[in-house]
């Protein structure tokens, strides 16, 4: 892959987008990152990212930059109006292909489009049964795939639950343990398909360089851990007690997100390993929990002992 090519990334200051952008910069690509906050521009520049200040709701703020890029990576997730924002992003990529030079798109979906898998291990061939939180996503995967009609090579990535650093769902569990000196977790027996965000960023790079257009890839570390095992590992390294929360409490507090966290999934990332040459370095959250706790402390700006 020609690393002089230009890559446009949405959500570049977000939990996933920041890690993905950093990995592409390290690989030598010219990265253009969309951010809503002009105050973040200097920080992005210092990290080797060309800041593009704008919003998905106003494509005119970023289309000139997008049209001049060779590939787009859509990672941004705005919970306030996620469906509309996602539609606008895909339409912008279409415009970038018709009127510009965009010829590749990596579209971020998620493993939750497969719904609850129970005790079964699934791969990409499993039927889609999206949970309510992401009910719209399966249709948007198809919209993204249709961009192939405009000579865009489209790859859809379906990550599981991402961990690492201080943000995200699992980062919130570390925060609860440290700040409240207690840890409640949803359910317990349900399986979570875990993936470290650095491994996820590597998968995006491999997908751009090696992925086949039209393919979908599940991304997880293959560890098949339950929510209880994740919570107990955090509790052990932070010195607190972990307790299961009643389902009614989880749903009342978190709504559709709570239902998502109660979803059980066993994911097989074999296709990504075979076709992308992707091998996650972090393969056991439980084994790495102490290191992950130190990573959480460091990224929160706390002195690490």
Feature roles, as predicted:
Residues 7-27:
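N-terminal Rossmann NAD(P)H-binding glycine-rich loop of SDR-like oxidoreductase domains
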Residues 35-96:
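NAD(P)H-binding glycine-rich loop region in Rossmannoid oxidoreductase-like domains
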Residues 91-133:
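Conserved Rossmann-fold NAD(P)-dependent oxidoreductase catalytic core, especially the SDR/UDP-sugar
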Residues 138, 162-174, 206-217, 223:
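Glycine/proline-rich active-site loop of Rossmann-fold NAD(P)-dependent oxidoreductases
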Residues 141-165:
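Conserved beta-loop-beta element that borders a ligand/cofactor-binding pocket
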Residues 175-195, 199:
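A conserved pocket-lining segment of Rossmann-fold NAD(P)-dependent short-chain dehydrogenase/reductase
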Residues 203-257, 297, 302-305:
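Mid/C-terminal beta-alpha module of Rossmann-like enzyme folds, strongest
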Residues 283-305:
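Amphipathic terminal alpha-helices
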């Amino acid at each position: 892959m020609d690393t002089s090519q230009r890559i446009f990334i949405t959500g570049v200051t977000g939990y996933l987008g920041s890690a993905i952008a950093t990995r592409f910069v390290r690989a030598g690509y010219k990265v253009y990152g969309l951010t809503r906050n002009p105050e973040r521009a200097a920080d992005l520049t210092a990290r080797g990212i060309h800041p593009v200040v704008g919003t998905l709701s106003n494509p005119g703020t970023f289309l000139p930059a997008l049209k001049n890029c060779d590939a787009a990576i859509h990672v941004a997730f705005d919970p306030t109006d996620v469906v509309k924002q996602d539609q606008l992003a895909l339409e912008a990529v279409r415009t970038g292909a018709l009127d510009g030079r965009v010829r590749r798109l990596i579209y971020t979906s998620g493993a939750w489009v497969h719904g609850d898998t129970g005790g079964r291990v699934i791969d990409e061939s499993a039927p889609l049964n999206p949970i309510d939180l992401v009910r719209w996503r399966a249709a948007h995967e198809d919209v993204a795939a249709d961009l192939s009609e405009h000579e865009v090579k489209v790859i859809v990535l379906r990550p599981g639950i991402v961990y690492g650093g201080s943000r995200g769902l699992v980062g919130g569990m570390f925060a609860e343990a440290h700040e409240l000196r207690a840890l409640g977790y949803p359910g317990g027996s349900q399986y979570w398909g875990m993936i470290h965000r650095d491994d996820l960023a590597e998968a995006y790079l491999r997908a751009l360089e090696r992925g086949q257009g039209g393919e979908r890839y599940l991304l997880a570390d293959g560890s098949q851990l339950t929510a209880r095992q994740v919570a107990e590992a955090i509790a052990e390294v932070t010195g607190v007690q972990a307790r299961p929360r009643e389902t009614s409490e989880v749903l009342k507090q978190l709504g559709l997100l709570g239902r998502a966290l109660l979803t059980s999934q066993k994911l097989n990332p074999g296709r990504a390993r075979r076709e992308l040459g992707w091998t996650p370095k972090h393969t056991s959250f439980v084994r790495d929990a102490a290191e992950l706790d130190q990573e959480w402390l460091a990224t929160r700006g706390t002195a690490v002992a």
